[in-house]
A protein has these predicted regions:
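The feature marks the mature, well-folded catalytic cores of soluble enzymes
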Residues: 1-261
Length: 261
């Protein structure tokens, strides 16, 4: 995670960003810290990346890389405003002894990649359409040595995979079908017939932008209906307020890069 010390909305690179609305910086930091504390209280180790001036979106730490079994596929951001974030993330991983692969193609880390270690022998789901170059999917497959399934995003409101699809445990997902092309919807329905299906209201509340450890599902307080759905599926929803981070187009998952070693 990376604290929102420099978080503000000073440019608009997704439909949720409104440069005319001022961010409450102290509230953003308070809410972020509550998310960090919640994850720690659930038994997880939280590493904190130092924020850098001039990079207001570094708080969305999930976008900086994607890791599987000790190997890290680095990010290359679509928009120049975020480009320098990739170097900060690379420094974290290389300094920590991870096997780091620098990308050739544009990709935005866990924003557009998700891993299911027990599904079909270990599968990566990968989104494209708005941020990540489809060629990055093949590149990630070579780096990570896992099959990568490409899914086309078609609604600009859900510009990253992690706004439209969430991993609930090692083999199960939740997703909003309307965010995907008809072909991708059919693929998801075939591969994950027991998925938790979200509706547009769930997705617009960033209810799919969640973090799950296989039992506890951490999601924002606006996603009440999504919390009810994951509870009905056998998980324990844990709600955290993240109203300020939503102003930049992100929520729980955007703020958390999961480390898989």
């Amino acid at each position: 995670m990376c604290p929102p010390d420099h978080f503000t909305v000073e440019y608009a690179i997704n439909p949720w960003m409104d440069i005319t609305v001022e961010v409450d910086a102290s509230l953003a930091l308070k809410q972020w810290d509550m998310l960090r504390t919640t994850l720690a209280d659930l038994g997880h180790t939280v590493h904190v990346l130092d924020p850098e001036p001039g990079l207001p979106d570094m708080v969305y730490a999930a976008n900086g890389a994607f890791s599987v079994d000790g190997t890290v596929y680095g990010a290359q951001f679509r928009h120049p405003q975020r480009a320098a974030e990739a170097l900060a993330h690379r420094g974290f991983y290389t300094g920590g002894g991870w096997d780091f692969a620098s990308p050739v193609h544009v990709n935005e880390g866990e924003g557009d990649f998700a891993y299911l270690p027990a599904a079909y022998g270990g599968m990566v789901l990968a989104g494209y359409g708005f941020r990540t170059d489809p060629a990055a999917h093949a590149e990630a497959q070579e780096v990570l040595r896992r099959p990568v399934l490409s899914l086309k995003l078609v609604d600009p409101a859900f510009y990253h995979l992690d706004t439209a699809l969430a991993v609930l445990d090692d083999r199960h997902i939740a997703y909003y079908p309307g965010a995907f092309s008809p072909a991708s919807q059919r693929v998801l329905a075939q591969l994950f017939p027991d998925a938790v299906i979200a509706d547009r209201q769930d997705a617009e509340a960033f209810g799919l932008n969640l973090v799950s450890d296989g039992r506890h599902v951490v999601l924002n307080t606006e996603a009440v209906a999504m919390g009810d759905k994951v509870r009905a599926a056998g998980y324990l929803p844990v709600h955290v307020e993240l109203t300020e981070l939503k102003r930049g187009g992100g929520s729980v998952k955007c703020a958390v890069a999961e480390l898989r070693r």
